[in-house]
């Protein structure tokens, strides 16, 4: 089974690219969705987060605003949160890969924002990076805010500043998909990759 790693900075268009793979019948592990499930009601991460960050879990529900405040500007607190989440996500990721192998899937996608930072790119046969101009990304973040998201633009810029640079991601990627261009361009790149992998298998 070929493992396709998919990553990119915030609002770079990973979800769009992942949706294109799903449309082609390729199973996708969505790390962000996994985190939301783990932090959701009765999620496995809740008791650990509540213990590490008192006041962030109320009536078995995560107060995301309180958690953001607890880690804002505190690298050691963010590291503590990551130390809780990363092992739990890893368990779910391995379960996903095991299920894909059991079904004899020819390909699967690991959609992970921190793919390179946690070293998961090394296990991938192909690494794809979704990329968009900074102006496009900030516009997407603002649109999410108008759609009911709670993250401020200042918080988003802070997160972007802490992430790996686009230049470094590009350097380590096999393929760069520029989602700021037309959707058709991304579709063609995904189709070309799948065709290449099918030809090689």
From Swiss-Prot:
Known catalytic reactions: 3'-dephospho-CoA + ATP = ADP + CoA + H(+)
Domain DPCK: 3-201
Main location: cytoplasm
Record: residues binding ATP: 11-16
Gene Ontology CC terms, in alphabetical order: cytoplasm
InterPro entries tied to this protein: Depp_CoAkinase (IPR001977), P-loop_NTPase (IPR027417)
Domain of life of the source: Bacteria
Pfam families from the UniProt entry: CoaE (PF01121)
UniProt record, GO biological process: coenzyme A biosynthetic process
PROSITE patterns: DPCK
Subcellular localization: Cytoplasm
Pathway the protein takes part in: Cofactor biosynthesis; coenzyme A biosynthesis; CoA from (R)-pantothenate: step 5/5
Record-listed E.C. numbers: 2.7.1.24
GO MF term set: ATP binding; dephospho-CoA kinase activity
Keywords: ATP-binding, Coenzyme A biosynthesis, Cytoplasm, Kinase, Nucleotide-binding, Transferase
Keyword ATP-binding: yes
Signal peptide residues on this chain, from the entry's feature table: none
Disulfide bond residue pairs: none
Function: Catalyzes the phosphorylation of the 3'-hydroxyl group of dephosphocoenzyme A to form coenzyme A.
Record-stated family: Belongs to the CoaE family.
Protein's recorded name: Dephospho-CoA kinase
């Amino acid at each position: 089974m070929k493992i396709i790693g998919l990553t990119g900075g915030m609002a770079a268009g990973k979800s769009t690219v992942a949706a294109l793979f799903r449309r082609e019948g390729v199973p996708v592990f969505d790390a962000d969705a996994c985190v939301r499930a783990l932090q959701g009601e009765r999620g496995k991460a809740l008791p650990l987060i509540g213990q590490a960050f008192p006041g962030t879990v109320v009536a078995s529900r995560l107060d995301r605003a309180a958690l953001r405040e607890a880690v804002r500007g505190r690298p050691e607190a963010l590291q503590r949160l990551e130390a809780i989440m990363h092992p739990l996500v890893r368990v779910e990721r391995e379960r996903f890969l095991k299920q894909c192998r059991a079904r004899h899937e020819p390909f699967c996608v690991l959609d992970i924002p921190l793919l390179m930072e946690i070293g998961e790119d090394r296990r991938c046969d192909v690494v794809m990076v979704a990329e968009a101009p900074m102006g496009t990304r900030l516009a997407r973040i603002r649109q999410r805010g108008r759609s009911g998201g709670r993250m401020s633009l200042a918080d988003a810029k802070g997160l972007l500043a802490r992430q790996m640079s686009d230049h470094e991601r590009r350097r380590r990627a096999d393929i760069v998909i520029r989602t700021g261009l037309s959707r058709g361009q991304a579709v063609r790149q995904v189709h070309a990759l799948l065709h290449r992998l099918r030809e090689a298998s």
